[in-house]
Design a protein with these regions (language model features):
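Buried hydrophobic-core signal for structured, non-transmembrane domains
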Residues: 1-3, 114-115
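Predominantly extracellular/luminal regions of secreted and cell-surface proteins
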Residues: 2-32, 67-68, 72-73
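Extracellular and select intracellular beta-sandwich modules with Ser/Thr-enriched
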Residues: 3, 125, 141-145
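Acidic, Ser/Thr/Pro-rich low-complexity intrinsically disordered segments
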Residues: 34-90, 97-98, 105-111, 116-125, ...
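Short, surface-exposed terminal/edge motifs of secreted or surface/virion proteins that either
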Residues: 127-131
Length: 152
């Protein structure tokens, strides 16, 4: 029941971080029973944070979809001044499919925000018995992915 309430509130109010990422550690977002590890839903953002120390020559952010989710469209964004929304992110990789990579050369030390956005969505229309969904309805189960940040 608690998970249902948390999912119902997702997308309402202030955005929340899914996690603070650690360099070199892949984070799997594929557990529907735990919201902090849940796949991303249609038109939703997942927000992460990472702290970059002094002396990092390059930061690479890799987003990889699971094989069963490879034909969904995920976008990847990064920002230093706050959440990485598509409209104001300093770095971004958009396009078809799930796998994306951002390379940030000579990142300044400090906090960086990383966001994953699911651009795949359904079509909703009024039918005889209410709202009917068509198109990519499989996205309603969420799109599983792995995100990893590496420093060089």
């Amino acid at each position: 029941m608690a998970a249902m309430v948390r999912y119902a509130l997702a997308g309402n109010g202030e955005p929340a971080l899914k996690a603070v990422l650690r360099p070199g550690e892949a984070r799997e977002m594929n557990d529907r029973s735990q919201p902090e590890f849940a796949p991303v839903g249609d038109r939703q953002y997942h927000h992460f944070r990472i702290d970059v120390p002094k002396g990092v020559g390059k930061m690479t952010i890799d987003l990889k979809g699971f094989a069963r989710a490879a034909d969904f469209d995920l976008h990847l964004f990064a920002n230093r001044t706050g959440f990485a929304w598509r409209e104001d992110a300093a770095w971004g990789h958009v396009g078809e499919k799930t796998d994306k990579r951002l390379v940030i050369p000579d990142p300044k030390p400090g906090t960086y925000y990383i966001s994953v956005f699911c651009a795949t969505t359904v079509t909703a229309s009024m039918g005889k018995y209410g709202v009917e969904y068509s198109g990519r309805t499989d996205v309603l189960n969420g799109v599983p992915y792995t995100i990893q940040v590496n420093f060089e």
